[in-house]
Curated annotation (Swiss-Prot):
GO terms for molecular function: hydroxymethylbilane synthase activity. Its EC number is 2.5.1.61. This is Porphobilinogen deaminase. It comes from Clostridium perfringens (strain SM101 / Type A). GO terms for biological process: protoporphyrinogen IX biosynthetic process. It catalyses: 4 porphobilinogen + H2O = hydroxymethylbilane + 4 NH4(+). It is an enzyme of class 2 (transferase).
Length: 291
């Protein structure tokens, strides 16, 4: 038997899927292969995501492959998965979470603190751009899209002083050496689910148990809390939303940020990790209470 796993065509998406394939072989002794899918988000690289429908554009065609029974499962970056799935699907596993931090990449090794006044920084993320302005309001934000390699090339092509990328993607691609600096995730909050992988299947799929065996309880605890936070705030690519969460013993600690009435609000919460979804909801309500 060979499971078919749908994924995007980018190098990073394929590397992430290969990690899941290795886990399937190691834990379940099951062979698998990739089904590469071109998504709308990959095709429309000329426009910011917030103008064309948000991050769901990276998953719709992949879900179609599942519906058409062309694949048994799909691997996503959890930060690309909308907070509400269509009723036919479920996230059966969240097998691992890499470094959750954002990373600063510059060709000369400059860090954010020693950049020249008015430096040009590339990012299309509202979350990154707005938080960046809190540190250095003199910086010029330049929208860039594309895969990791394309964005790094744009430092030279668009005369940028640096760009911001997820550390997880760079590490998975073996490109950690291009990182000039890391952002403290408790200060510069990551995207919801950043660094985590998710496996999506049709509900009650015949082979779902193989994928479920790869689930990490701790990863699921943090990511579900963050997604609960995002759901209450109805956040996506159109607004600043970020969260940091960590499990320590029986506790879950979360920090969240969101824009309320054009003001960036940041709050935290601590509680029992078994109440992760409730904690995410309460943190969102705490922020909305600032209205």
């Amino acid at each position: 038997m060979e499971l078919i796993i749908a994924t995007r065509k980018s190098k990073l998406a394929q590397v992430q899927t290969e990690k899941v394939m290795e886990l399937l072989k190691k834990k379940e002794n099951v062979d698998s292969k990739k089904l590469l899918v071109m998504t709308e988000g990959d095709r429309r690289l000329d426009v910011s995501l917030n103008k064309i429908g948000g991050k769901g554009l990276f998953v719709k065609e992949i879900e179609l492959a599942l519906l058409n029974k062309e694949a048994h499962g799909a691997v996503h970056s959890m930060k690309d998965v909308p907070f509400e799935l269509p009723s036919e699907f479920e996230l059966v596993a969240m097998p691992e979470r890499e470094d959750i931090r954002d990373a600063f990449v510059s060709l000369n090794g400059s860090t954010l603190s020693n950049l020249r006044k008015g430096a040009r920084i590339g990012t299309s993320s509202i979350r990154r751009a707005e938080q960046l302005k809190l540190f250095r309001d003199d910086l010029e934000i330049v929208p860039i899209r594309g895969n990791v390699q394309t964005r790094i090339k744009k430092i030279t092509e668009e005369n940028l002083d640096g760009i911001i990328l997820a550390a997880a993607g760079l590490k998975r691609l073996g490109m950690e050496d291009v990182i000039s600096d890391y952002f403290d995730p408790k200060v510069f909050l990551p995207a919801i689910g950043q660094g985590a992988l998710g496996i999506e299947c049709l509900k009650d799929g015949e082979f779902n148990d193989y994928f479920k065996a790869l689930d990490s309880k701790e990863v699921r605890t943090t990511v579900e809390a963050e997604r609960s936070f995002m759901k209450v705030l109805n956040g996506g690519c159109h607004s600043l939303i970020g969260a940091y969460s960590e499990v320590k013993d029986n506790d879950l600690y979360m920090i969240g940020t969101f824009t309320v009435n054009n003001r960036i609000v940041k709050k935290d919460i601590l509680g029992n990790k078994e109440d992760n979804i409730l904690l995410g909801k309460k943190l969102a309500e705490k922020i909305l209470g600032e209205v």
